[in-house]
Amino acid sequence: MWPRHKVEAMTDQAEQASAAQSTAPEIPGKPTSASRTTLSHIMTHSDTNLLGTVHGGVIMKLVDDAAGAVAGRHSGGPAVTASMDEMAFLEPVRVGDLVHVKAQVNWTGRSSMEVGVRVLAERWNESAPATQVGSAYLVFAAVDADGKPRTVPPVLPETEKDKRRYQEAQIRRTHRLARRRAIMELRERRVAEGYED
């Protein structure tokens, strides 16, 4: 995990670079299916919390692993987690469940990507189809060998569902930037009024 201040700085750089017009040559786009992946894992006793269900942190690690693989595959190199939005735990996961973590790139900026993740569980003692137990949206920044943002290929939504996900990702990005701007303005006002944070 990267230090928070470094991730925030990289996120800021990636978001600013995404908003700016690029003079670099255009990189060919990649369809959503090119990086879509599924990571599967059987949950064991070592994954449980005090209640006997799988610890949320274990699920979050699987989510980050799958999303990181997708971001690296799409960008063609290293990508670091910049933020995680809306991690939702819908149902408990139990020991013995076969968990499938499905991830794909929903949106790309100049050097950042949103990866959408769905978590499904097949109950070991039931013959029912897999149940959705969680979901999350993560933002990754593609980086070069020096840790500086690098350009990523644009994602090319293929289906109507992919197009909807792309549009929803744009809304989340707009909200994320507005929230960050509002917080910075509040902090600046407080400093101007003489408050120490």
Protein language model annotation of sequence segments:
Residues 2, 6-21, 26-27, 34, ...:
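HotDog/MaoC-like acyl-thioester-processing domains
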Residues 32, 36-53:
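Extended boundary segments
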Residues 40, 44, 73-74, 88:
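N-terminal leader/targeting segments and the first structural element of proteins
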Residues 48-62, 195-197:
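A conserved, well-ordered hydrophobic junction motif at loop->secondary-structure transitions
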Residues 76-92:
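Small beta-barrel nucleic-acid-binding modules, principally OB-folds
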